[in-house]
């Protein structure tokens, strides 16, 4: 999709008014929830997980992404450069390779008028010869935001504790909040009233699932998760989802039977079975995930909703989903991938430009 060159820093004024939704309190059960409202006007607010946000805040973030998409697609001319990232640098600290996250983040920063500075593991000290804490102290003194893609979630927690600017989680082994914003935007584009619909996750229990399940719960979407017995959802993550589901009245269930998970499902989702760093486990995982491939046959056997749709955050392997489904009209995969851009714009607009303020 071609993007207008003039769409730059002033996007914030176009996006400023988003409908208010019912607010609920955020549940914080584990970890250092660094993105709580700042204790002082000068303290940064970080975005490390969907669990860091109240339901109202998360809905506002998705609405902002939706408005960003509408502004770009309709060719609206932003009114003023002073409200964006003009004159600001966003450090993109990636210890893992990336396609969608890197491209969407760099593009989002550029649209908002800022300078994206990519810092890979071979460019700077990322816990090698210098502590992450010290690295964060130094880099945050020179930039306006750090977008970090790391391994252990503890790494991004250290970065956020030391940082004097907002830190946005671009992926950790525990959470992937930008993907969750993307996925809920995609879901609500296809199901305008998602409360009460069912999403089935078929595959590995991983970071994408955890934030997506929390996000679904905040929207009142029922979630059914099917994983092999050897790869259950960790109890602490399951509790986070249950807490959010309790507040919204939605349901969360787990099973080891894919057919049970997809019964009545409006959306079927899967992800990679072998994440980065798990290559040595590939042969074993392929055996243990036998029967978990998403296919039309699985949906039929399980009794999925007749109009079910399919999602996958990419990259995809054929053992995870058949070509028949992946490239079918049921598939939302490529619109979902495009929506990563609008999620990145919304996150930067909220946590950097507005300093974590979700009001109108």
Please tell me what each predicted stretch does.
Residues 1-37:
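N-terminal mitochondrial targeting presequence
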Residues 27-103, 107, 175:
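Positively charged, low-complexity intrinsically disordered leader regions
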Residues 89-142:
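Active-site cofactor/substrate anionic-group-binding motifs, chiefly glycine-
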Residues 95-107, 189-270:
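Glycine-rich phosphate/diphosphate-binding loop of Rossmann-like nucleotide-binding domains
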Residues 136-139, 144-215, 312:
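Anion-binding alpha/beta catalytic cores of soluble intermediary-metabolism enzymes, centered on
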Residues 243-324:
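Rossmann-like adenosine-cofactor binding region
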Residues 305-309, 313-360:
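Adenosine-phosphate binding glycine-rich loop
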């Amino acid at each position: 999709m071609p993007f207008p060159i003039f769409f730059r820093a002033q996007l914030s004024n176009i996006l400023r008014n988003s409908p208010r939704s019912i607010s609920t309190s955020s549940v914080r059960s584990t970890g250092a929830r660094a993105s709580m409202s700042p204790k002082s006007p000068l303290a940064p607010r970080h975005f490390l997980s969907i669990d860091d946000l109240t339901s109202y805040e998360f809905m506002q973030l998705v609405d902002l992404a939706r408005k960003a998409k509408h502004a770009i697609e309709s060719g609206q001319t932003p009114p003023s450069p002073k409200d964006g990232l003009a004159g600001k640098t966003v450090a993109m600290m990636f210890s893992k390779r990336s396609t969608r996250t890197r491209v969407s983040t760099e593009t989002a920063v550029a649209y908002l008028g800022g300078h994206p500075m990519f810092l890979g593991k071979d460019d700077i000290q990322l816990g090698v010869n210098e502590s992450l804490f010290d690295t964060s102290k130094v880099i945050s003194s020179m930039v306006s935001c750090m977008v970090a893609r790391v391994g252990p979630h503890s790494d991004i927690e250290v970065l956020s504790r030391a940082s004097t600017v907002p830190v946005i989680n671009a992926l950790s082994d525990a959470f992937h909040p930008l993907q969750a914003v993307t996925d809920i935007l995609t879901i609500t584009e296809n199901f305008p009233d998602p409360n009460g619909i069912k999403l089935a996750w078929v595959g590995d229990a991983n970071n994408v699932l955890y934030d997506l399940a929390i996000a679904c719960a905040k929207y009142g979407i029922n979630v059914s998760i099917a994983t092999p017995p050897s790869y259950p959802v960790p109890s602490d993550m399951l509790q986070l989802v249950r807490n959010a589901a309790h507040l919204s009245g939605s349901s969360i269930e787990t099973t080891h039977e894919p057919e049970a998970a997809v019964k009545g499902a409006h959306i079927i989702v899967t992800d990679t079975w072998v994440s980065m760093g798990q290559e040595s486990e590939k042969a074993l995982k392929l055996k243990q995930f036998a029967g978990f491939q998403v296919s039309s046959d699985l949906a039929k056997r399980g009794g999925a909703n007749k109009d079910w749709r399919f999602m996958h955050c990419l990259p995809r392997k054929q053992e995870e989903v058949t070509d028949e489904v992946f490239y079918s009209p049921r598939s939302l995969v490529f619109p979902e991938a495009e929506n990563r851009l609008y999620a990145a714009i919304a996150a930067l607009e909220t946590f950097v430009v507005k300093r974590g303020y979700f009001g109108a």
